Each structure stands twice: as C-alpha cells, then as structure tokens.
C-alpha cells in the first residue's frame, strides 16, 4: 500500500471508522468508494476485505487519481470520473451487484487549502472551483457570462444566501467594468465583492461562505450528480448491501434523507381501495440510522462539526 503523501497528511478523513464499519458487512464483497479523495476510507476498507473482496473508487480530481494510482493492491481499482457514472462504470467492469456504496460528499481539505484550486475565499487564487480542472467551465468563465437571474438563482438556491439578488447585481456591475479593470478572475476579488454587499455578519462565518459554496456546487453539478448516484446505488446494491453517505451541509443532507425515506416507505394507497397491506410491494431500503462526529473528532478536526452520516440497507431483492 502506498505511503502517505503530503496532501494526505493534511487531510483528516471524517467519520473514518464509523463509515467503514457501517459499510463493510462481508469480507468478500464488492464495494464502491464514490469519493476517493486522499484515500482514507478506501485504505481502511481494503484492510477489512478478504482476498476475494474488491473495492472500486471514483474521483474527478487528478491529484486524487495520482494518489490512488500508488495503491498497488490487486483488489483495488480507481475510476477517473464522477460518481454519477457509477452505473456505466460497473457495467463496463462486469459488476452486476455491489455490497456497499460509500459517498463522502463535498470538497476535501487539500482542495480547499490549495489557493490554486480556487475553492477558498481565505487566500487569493485563480477563480476555478472545478473538481477536475481539466474538464468543463471554470467559475471565472461562468461568472463572465451568467445573467443576473442565473446568478441570483444559483446563489439563492445553492448557497441559501438572502442577499443573492444584491450579490448578483454587484457581479454583473463588476463585469461591466471589465474593459477598465480586466475580467473577474480571482477568489480574493470575488470575496471582496460579496463582503461589500453582505453587511450583516453570521457569527464565525465569512460573508463569502454561502456564495462560494453556491458557485462551487453549480460549477460541479454536485446536487444533480448526487441524485443520479443515489438512484444508481439503489439499483446496484445486493440484498443486505449498505448505502453510506456523509454530507456537510443541509442541501446535500436533505436530498439524502428524502431519498432514503422515500425508498424505505410502503407506497401510500387510498384506504378505500380493496388492497391489503401484504399485497403492497416491500420498500427496498431499511434506514439504519444517522451518525454525527464525536466531540473528540470535532476537537481534532473542526470540519467534522457539520458532518452527518446516513446509513441505509437494501432489504428487498
């Protein structure tokens, strides 16, 4: 197994033991780590697997892929794609069913801590925000063309920012000055534009937090891809297989919670119809529960404070 790299030393995997314990129910199973990151969960899963077990991991980030490629364990494979391609990737590998799917959502510490990636408002850097900088539209490119309405909707819906319209107008006004000032291409300037608009302050939170989150989610299509992978995971899980999802903000957690609840409930029917409960199809999932980081983990890793892990098990064939 590969030694830790510098970025791995900086990255503390949240809910490491709890997630792997919930995920791995059989040592000979086929498991999916939808978000390899720097490999914390994947390495522990491999420790739990027997010789016939298998782990397939996904990540968009080229740096994560480079780390994963150092793992020479024959039971391990890495896919340089979004976890939204889960169904296709499994079909290409001849995998019909899996024993568990783990998703550790959001941005990783190495991504946030590297100003060159453009995720952070705390250090100036290029306004990129792509999980995979080699594909798709950067944040700067999108901000250079988005309308006030588009900006407002993204910042409001994905950032839950009540000053979304005012921020959108300020961004478009800044764009009108591009001939004189040049294009908006730095995280520092974006953060300052937002700070000039958001006059009220949330305790312990930078005024740019919500806007940066919103733009990042939009650029990477995070919520849409989450919906896709949840459906794919449900279709691939074998009976007794586990779906384990760690989320870090309410938008993600709400999607996961509603998905699990919807598939753990018996369909509602009109009570006036002559249908017996035993005639209704069994729900495919059973909700195992949710887990929060311990006080000790939060003290050691403040990022864990907002983490919520939800676990469900496939009970119907």
Swiss-Prot record:
Its main location: cytoplasm. Belongs to the methyltransferase superfamily. RsmH family. Pfam families: Methyltransf_5 (PF01795). GO terms for biological process: rRNA base methylation. It comes from the Bacteria. This is Ribosomal RNA small subunit methyltransferase H. Its EC number is 2.1.1.199. The keyword Transferase applies. Specifically methylates the N4 position of cytidine in position 1402 (C1402) of 16S rRNA. The lineage of its organism: Bacteria, Pseudomonadati, Pseudomonadota, Betaproteobacteria, Burkholderiales. It catalyses: cytidine(1402) in 16S rRNA + S-adenosyl-L-methionine = N(4)-methylcytidine(1402) in 16S rRNA + S-adenosyl-L-homocysteine + H(+). Keywords: Cytoplasm, Methyltransferase, rRNA processing, S-adenosyl-L-methionine, Transferase. InterPro entries: RsmH, SAM-dep_MeTrfase_MraW_recog, SAM-dependent_MTases_sf. The keyword DNA-binding does not apply. One of its GO terms (cellular component) is cytoplasm. S-adenosyl-L-methionine binds at residues 39-41, 59, 83, 104, 111. One of its GO terms (molecular function) is rRNA (cytosine-N4-)-methyltransferase activity.
């Amino acid at each position: 197994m590969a030694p830790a790299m510098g970025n791995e030393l900086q990255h503390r995997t949240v809910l490491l033991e709890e997630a792997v314990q919930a995920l791995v129910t059989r040592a000979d199973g086929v498991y999916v780590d939808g978000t390899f990151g720097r490999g914390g969960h994947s390495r522990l899963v491999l420790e739990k697997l027997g010789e016939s077990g298998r782990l397939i991991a996904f990540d968009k980030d080229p740096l994560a892929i480079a780390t994963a490629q150092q793992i020479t364990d024959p039971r391990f494979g890495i896919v340089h794609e979004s976890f939204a391609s889960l169904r296709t990737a499994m079909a290409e590998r001849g995998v019909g069913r899996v024993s568990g799917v783990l998703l550790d959502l959001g941005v990783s510490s190495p991504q946030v801590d590297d100003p060159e990636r453009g995720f952070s408002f705390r250090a100036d850097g290029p306004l990129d925000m792509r999980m995979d900088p080699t594909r798709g539209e950067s944040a700067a490119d999108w901000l250079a063309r988005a309308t006030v309405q588009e900006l407002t909707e993204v910042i409001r819906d994905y950032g839950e920012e009540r000053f979304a319209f005012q921020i959108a107008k300020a961004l478009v006004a800044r764009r009108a000055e591009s001939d004189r000032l040049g294009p908006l291409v730095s995280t520092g300037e974006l953060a300052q534009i937002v700070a000039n608009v958001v006059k009220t302050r949330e305790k312990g939170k930078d005024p740019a937090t919500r806007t940066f989150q919103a733009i990042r989610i939009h650029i990477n299509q995070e919520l849409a891809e989450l919906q896709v992978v949840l459906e794919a995971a449900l279709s691939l899980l074998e009976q007794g297989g586990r779906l384990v999802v760690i989320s870090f903000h309410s938008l993600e957690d709400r999607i996961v919670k509603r998905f699990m609840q919807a598939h753990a409930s018996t369909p509602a029917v009109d009570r006036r119809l002559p249908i017996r409960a035993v005639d209704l199809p069994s729900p495919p999932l059973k909700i195992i529960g949710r887990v929060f980081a311990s006080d000790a983990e939060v003290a050691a890793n403040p990022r864990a404070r907002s983490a919520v892990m939800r676990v469900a098990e496939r009970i119907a064939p």
